[in-house]
Amino acid sequence: QNKGRYLYKYAGAFLEEATFWCLKEKFPQAQKFRVANTIGKRPKQFEIDCLINQDAIEIKWRDATTDGDHITKEHTRIQAIKESGYTPIRIMFYYPNRDQAIRIQATLKTIYDGVGGPYYAGDAAWDYLQQYTGIDLKHILGTIAEINKGK
């Protein structure tokens, strides 16, 4: 189980970082950015994984949380981003497996929809990244995996 957690942690971090660099390649002005929490007291700021003009992109390889506080924090984060004049966009490459986590993702999608922020998950996330950047990261990673198969 520890090996699995280790793999998930680092593979996920790699995918999120690779996604940021795809966005940065297409849009050199892309940057990580913080907005003030104008809704609540904690945290004082929220990080935007990738800000490109008015697009505030949240990059997740997967979000398997089942914590109810997660919805509250995400709702506050999305509202603060919107109030700061940005469009919150979520791209999540892999959907969680557990029922409670799936329900939380459905709630988050509703929150994004409510502020006019797109929410892309699974294949839609890969497609969005390719359309937005012109870079087919899924294909690139598949090619790397194929080259290294059996090594």
Whereabouts are the PLM-identified features?
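Active-site metal-binding core of divalent-cation-utilizing nuclease and nuclease-like domains
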Residues: 32-51
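Conserved catalytic cores of phosphodiester-cleaving nucleases, focusing on short active-site segments
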Residues: 50-61
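Interdomain/boundary linker segments immediately adjacent to catalytic/signaling cores
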Residues: 1-27
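Domain-level recognition of nuclease-like catalytic cores that cleave nucleotide substrates
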Residues: 93-151
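Amphipathic coiled-coil/heptad-repeat helices and related helical stalk/stem segments
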Residues: 16, 43-44, 74
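Catalytic cores of nucleic-acid endonucleases
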Residues: 61-113
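Secondary-structure boundary elements
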Residues: 24-31, 53, 83-85
